[in-house]
Design a protein with these regions (language model features):
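Bacterial N-terminal signal peptides that target proteins for export
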Residues: 2-14
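Beta-solenoid repeat scaffold
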Residues: 59-67, 71-95, 108-112, 349
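Glycine- and acidic/polar-rich repeat regions and solenoidal domains
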Residues: 72-75, 92-108, 116, 120-342, ...
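Surface beta-loop-beta hairpin patches that serve as ligand-binding interfaces in beta-rich domains
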Residues: 346-395
């Protein structure tokens, strides 16, 4: 039987490192369960499209969508506690320029929604912010999904009791090209967790933008690659209690902005103004100068520790503490040309990290490495801590 766990609980489990919120098994054969029905979608099913399922879904239902392409199919999901899951592969919602309510491919109005194994692409709206998912309900978990060629990948509203967890998912080539639409845009919610994901090739906008009160951006691959032209890699415009740990961050040659991580640039409006930037690898390939971290606001608590900075001379612009960061043009990468940023045995970053301590009860020492594609590998206990986000090649 499939037991639902709230998005809030999943976020707590994942960010605390108690146990990963991994993909849950599909419900067993019976078409009903103690929490709701199982609605099956596909060419050979009574419900041929996801939108047909959305029209009849009740609270607690699980919608199993056969792996296939559903061109031009858009939907509003109003029921609470839904599971929306692609089966036996990815269910591709190829909007082809269409949208629900001139907002998104899927407008999710219900609370506590789980989305797995779904690909959403091609949303366009007159306001130029057509999203793969527009989250209007409270609480969303997204896992093993893909968002591409929309004007926004995911766009959420403001809800001070909403928690957003996104993991093992990919965002690319989203944006209207105007700088106001992004691969991923989280509104003023309680917490946002992004882990084991890849965000790349935003069309002028940011790879990750969040106004959440708390942000946990952990073990991701955030890159322009050869031909991307994003703005900020990570934008936290209102600050917030934010942990940025173990990410591979790259500014490409065509990046629009010279700042990788921007904090509180639109005003320190969130209750907490604490930023911990620990064990990230930053590669700047812009010809112009670049800054790894720019901080605004008065008297925020900011610590940048154990970061590996390549191609930029500036780690931190603005208030804060910078400790044990390695700025070098000779980092000892295994194969930088192929974006393999693991360390060779002779790298000056190998084993050169220091204990970053804790933020409250949150342990700042990285527990994982990002692993392509869209995965992770645990950091071996007892290994000396490197500087940067990557392990030694061959280990």
């Amino acid at each position: 039987m499939h037991h639902r766990t709230s998005a809030r609980r999943l976020a707590v489990i994942s960010t605390a490192g108690i146990g990963l919120a991994l993909a849950q098994a599909a419900p067993a054969a019976p078409a009903t369960s103690s929490i709701g029905r199982v609605l099956r979608v596909g060419a050979s099913e009574p419900l041929r499209t996801p939108s047909a399922a959305a029209a009849v879904a009740h609270d607690g239902d699980t919608v199993e969508i056969a792996a296939d392409t559903y061109p031009g199919d858009v939907a509003v999901w109003s029921a609470n506690h839904l599971t929306l899951r692609g089966m036996n592969g990815m269910a591709h919602l190829a909007a082809n320029g269409k949208s629900a309510q001139q907002k998104a491919i899927w407008v999710i109005r219900g609370n506590d929604t789980l989305v797995e194994h779904v690909e959403l692409s091609g949303c366009r709206v007159p306001d130029r912010n057509g999203a793969g998912i527009r989250q209007e309900g409270r609480g969303l978990t997204v896992r093993h999904c893909s968002f591409h060629d929309n004007e926004d990948g995911i766009l959420t509203g403001a809800d001070p009791q909403s928690d957003i967890l996104i993991e093992f998912s990919e965002f690319h080539h989203n944006g209207a090209g105007d700088g106001y639409s992004h691969n991923l845009y989280i509104g003023q919610v309680r917490s946002f967790t992004l882990q084991f994901c890849a965000s790349h090739h935003a069309k002028t906008g940011h790879l990750v933008k969040s106004r959440a009160q708390s942000n946990f951006i952990l073990y991701n691959r955030l890159m322009d690659e050869e031909d991307g032209a994003s703005s900020y890699v990570i934008d936290l415009p209102n600050g917030g209690r934010s942990m940025i740990i173990g990410n591979i961050i790259q500014h490409g040659a065509h990046a629009e902005n010279g700042v990788a991580i921007s904090y509180a640039a639109e005003g320190a409006k969130n209750a907490s103004q604490e930023l911990q930037v620990v064990n990230n690898t930053y590669i700047n390939e812009r010809k112009a100068s670049a800054v790894f971290l720019r901080v605004a606001g008065q008297n925020p608590t900011v610590r940048a520790i154990n970061n590996l900075v390549v191609g930029s001379k500036s780690v931190l612009a603005g208030p804060g503490e910078s400790s044990n960061n390695l700025v070098t043009d000779a980092p000892g990468f295994a194969d930088a040309a192929r974006h393999d940023f693991r360390l060779v045995a002779q790298s000056p970053a190998r084993g050169a990290g220091i204990d970053p301590g804790k933020s409250g009860e949150f342990n700042l020492t990285p527990a994982f490495f990002y692993l392509d594609p869209l995965g992770s590998t645990p950091r071996a206990k007892g290994d000396k801590l490197n500087i940067g986000a990557c392990p030694v090649s061959g280990k």
